[in-house]
Curated annotation (Swiss-Prot):
Domain named Obg: residues: 2-160
Protein name: GTPase Obg
Organism: Streptococcus pyogenes serotype M12 (strain MGAS2096)
Pfam families named in the record: DUF1967, GTP1_OBG, MMR_HSR1
Protein encoded by which gene: obg
InterPro entries, alphabetized: G_OBG, GTP-bd, GTP-bd_Obg/CgtA, GTP-bd_prot_GTP1/OBG_C_sf, GTP1-OBG_CS, GTP1_OBG_dom, GTP1_OBG_dom_sf, OBG_GTPase
């Protein structure tokens, strides 16, 4: 079985928009030709698309950087530059995408073909044909292309198994999976033989089929990182039915009922919603001595926790090694799956509104002013820096336009209030100029 990569850290960068062009119409018999510079093309966006054929995040181990192409520059005759194609990145079903800096969930990719724009391409800069006015019919102004969005992301794969096997190490989960499916998990008589999830397709005699995941063994304290810890608890978040496998022979000296309670406590501690999933108790190793007596004691303790009118969890005595009781277990599992809906991983309120990434929040500051040790005033802020990088600093008219934009944003007034004097150095990024009062 292929290794399942649970998480991957990658960077994505959308393409920059193409620069607008400064050009003028110069043709014979056309006097006083006006501006003729076209707009730059848009930069390519980075789009994640779900491919149900992918089962792991293995590809992201070797390719961690994804960069879309930039748009082409504007041309003469008012022609626009060609926009860049979007970069499509294929991800498995069940991939959760988080912002690595904030930890917020950006999107949950669960449907085949689902697409989400992860990083938006930059807008193409406007050519000088766009800036013509009656007062300035021949402007030497053009914008640089807007930079594309850049992000650091964390990908997390939630296995899309219908049924998850949970239980203490060495209770027989791997053996059960190998017997009822074509999966070939590593099997051993020691703890944590399974260190990665194994998936197998199960088909019942009645023709029903479902995916079953043999998940690494849980121990008490797993939700706090003990043993194999929380990295594997996340795998059962998507399973619709949980098969709780218990070693009813108590071959390692533990009480079967205490095992049952301990594992359920870990599931509840990790995520309260896990306990909403229906559970079937699988009493394994029933071919071993004392298993029958232990099962009687288990049922008695379990019943004591319920009112007489409550429905007790289903219990199926089996032996994976002896192939006993498996057919009834699988048929009951298929029936339970048929009437169990999928569970949402997150409340809708936890998902980030995509608009928050493609616009500016009303409460966001347009700029910030700090002062370096060398007495230089430093201007920063997403909106201000965006205007700066889209300004062609090689043309005087563009610089004057940028100065007017700063004045309109209130930068000049804010500098005066902070004590800036005529001739003080001011810096935006690596560009430095003098403050003129």
């Amino acid at each position: 079985m292929s290794m399942f990569l649970d998480t991957a850290k990658i960077s994505v960068q959308a393409g920059r928009g193409g620069d607008g062009m400064v050009a003028f119409r110069r043709e014979k018999y056309v006097p006083n030709g006006g501006p003729w510079g076209g707009d730059g093309g848009k930069g390519g966006s980075v789009i994640f698309r779900v491919d149900e054929g992918l089962r792991t995040l293995m590809d992201f181990r070797y390719n961690r950087k994804f960069k879309a192409k930039s748009g082409e520059k504007g041309m003469t005759k008012g022609m626009h530059g060609r926009g860049a194609e979007d970069l499509i990145v294929f991800v498995p079903q069940g991939t959760t995408v988080r912002d690595a800096e904030t930890g917020k969930v950006i999107t949950d990719l669960v449907e085949h073909g689902q697409e989400v724009v992860i990083a938006k391409g930059g807008r193409g800069g406007r050519g000088n044909i766009r800036f013509a006015t009656p007062r300035n019919p021949a402007p030497e102004i053009a914008e640089n292309g807007e930079p594309g969005e850049e992000r650091q992301l964390e990908l997390e794969l939630k296995i899309l198994a219908d049924v998850g096997l949970v239980g203490f190490p060495s209770v027989g989960k791997s053996t059960l999976l190998s017997v009822v499916s074509s999966a070939k998990p590593k099997i051993g008589a020691y703890h944590f033989t399974t260190i990665v999830p194994n998936l197998g397709m199960v088909r019942t005699k009645s023709g029903d089929s479902f995916a079953m995941a043999d998940l690494p063994g849980l121990i008490e304290g797993a939700s706090q990182g003990v043993g194999l810890g929380t990295q594997f608890l996340r795998h059962i978040e998507r399973t619709r039915v949980i098969l709780h496998v218990i070693d009813m022979s108590a071959s390692e000296g533990r009480d079967p009922y205490e095992d049952y309670v301990s594992i359920n406590n870990e599931l509840e501690t990790y995520n309260l919603r896990l306990m909403e999933r229906p559970q079937i108790i699988v009493a394994n190793k029933m071919d071993m001595p004392e298993a029958q007596e232990n099962l009687k004691a288990f049922k008695k303790k379990l019943a004591a926790q319920y009112d007489e009118f409550d429905d007790l969890p289903m219990i199926f005595p089996i032996s994976s090694l002896a192939h006993q009781g498996l057919e009834n277990l699988l048929e009951a599992t298929a029936e339970l799956l048929a009437k169990t809906d999928e569970f949402l991983l997150y409340d809708e309120a936890d998902l980030v509104d995509e608009e928050a990434y493609y616009g500016f929040a009303e409460t966001e500051k347009d700029f910030e002013i700090t002062r370096d040790d060398d007495a230089t005033w430093v201007l920063s802020g997403e909106k201000l820096e965006r205007l700066f990088v889209m300004t062609n600093m090689e043309r005087d008219e563009s610089i004057m336009k940028f100065a007017r934009q700063l004045r309109g944003m209130g930068v000049d007034e804010a500098l005066r209030e902070r004590g800036a004097k005529d001739g003080d150095p001011v810096r935006i990024g690596k560009f430095e100029f003098e403050f003129v009062d």
